[in-house]
Amino acid sequence: MNATTSAAAYGPLAGADLEAELAQARVTDDAVRDAAIVDRDGGASVVPLARRRPGSPAPGDAVTLSGVSKRFGTRTVLDNVELGIARGSFVAIVGRSGCGKSTLLRLVAGLETPSSGALATRGEGGGTLDTRIMYQDARLLPWKTVLQNVMLGLGRGARDRARAVLDEVGLLERANDWPAQLSGGQRQRVALARALVHRPQLLLLDEPLGALDALTRIEMHALIERLWREHRFTALLVTHDVQEAVALGDRILLIEQGRVALDQQVPLDRPRARASAAFAALEDRVLQRVLAGGPGGADQEAAREVDHVRPVGQIRWAV
């Protein structure tokens, strides 16, 4: 895929354009409301969510970047990036604010196109790589219940799948509640369920836990790791938290001044023992490398605010 390829070629991403998504939701409100009736006494049965594929992930790279650069006006945010993301791996991306890590995630998602170079995504069997993205803001529709939010964009037949994935994230009993009734961590669990109900091959995580307290973050780490191990999707996490990167990643990438400055494997057993000397040593090694890079200048990614205004109708609503 070259720099001129349409973002649509990346395949489905957590629903269609925002306007189309909201229009679809209004059309199907009655059907979804009927489907969202859940027995509060817990008597309703739950059909386990089918695993997308059993066993080990298929070999090869799910995402490949070859000489990819991204510029906003005169600012170069990513500079000649060469990178392959192995299918079924969990890759964490760290770096200072403005280094280009979120821009990299948006390129992989198809929300931006490269200024130069080639970016290829490949699903199993050579098909489309089904991709979902999760942000720090859960982006739940406040006028829909938890179950309706998970079912957004899906038909009545998805009710059992939605209930099953809510059960997996520990929120089946909150299916009839409104988003305003949930804590921040619970809202992020709903956002995660809404991504997983589509059984994605690639899950992109753009600092999804940044606004949560420390204990809730640790709980979410365990949940994300468990679901990743069960479903074997490819995961790409952007985070400022080096400890989070070591806790979740098989591999840690440091983006510095638009380039991959460090590519560190994480040779630690799962689940990660955070109190172990090996964990602390690896965390310190990566953190010291991040600090050694210096502040690196102004926040280049903020250039999107000035130089790259995207029409509302083109904005994709992720997750």
Swiss-Prot record:
Its EC number is 7.6.2.14. It catalyses: ATP + H2O + aliphatic sulfonate-[sulfonate-binding protein]Side 1 = ADP + phosphate + aliphatic sulfonateSide 2 + [sulfonate-binding protein]Side 1. Keywords: ATP-binding, Cell inner membrane, Cell membrane, Membrane, Nucleotide-binding, Translocase, Transport. ATP binds at residues 95-102. It is found in: Cell inner membrane. Disulfide bonds: none annotated. GO terms for molecular function: ATP binding; ATP hydrolysis activity. One of its GO terms (cellular component) is plasma membrane. It comes from the Bacteria. Its main location: membrane. Gene3D superfamilies: P-loop containing nucleotide triphosphate hydrolases (3.40.50.300). It is a peripheral membrane protein. Pfam families: ABC_tran (PF00005). InterPro entries: AAA+_ATPase, ABC_transporter-like_ATP-bd, ABC_transporter-like_CS, ABC_transporter_ATP-bind, P-loop_NTPase. Residues 63-282 form the ABC transporter domain. It is an enzyme of class 7 (translocase). The complex is composed of two ATP-binding proteins (SsuB), two transmembrane proteins (SsuC) and a solute-binding protein (SsuA). Part of the ABC transporter complex SsuABC involved in aliphatic sulfonates import. Responsible for energy coupling to the transport system. Belongs to the ABC transporter superfamily. Aliphatic sulfonates importer (TC 3.A.1.17.2) family. PANTHER family: ALIPHATIC SULFONATES IMPORT ATP-BINDING PROTEIN SSUB (PTHR42788:SF17), TAURINE IMPORT ATP-BINDING PROTEIN-RELATED (PTHR42788). This is Aliphatic sulfonates import ATP-binding protein SsuB. It comes from Burkholderia ambifaria (strain ATCC BAA-244 / DSM 16087 / CCUG 44356 / LMG 19182 / AMMD).
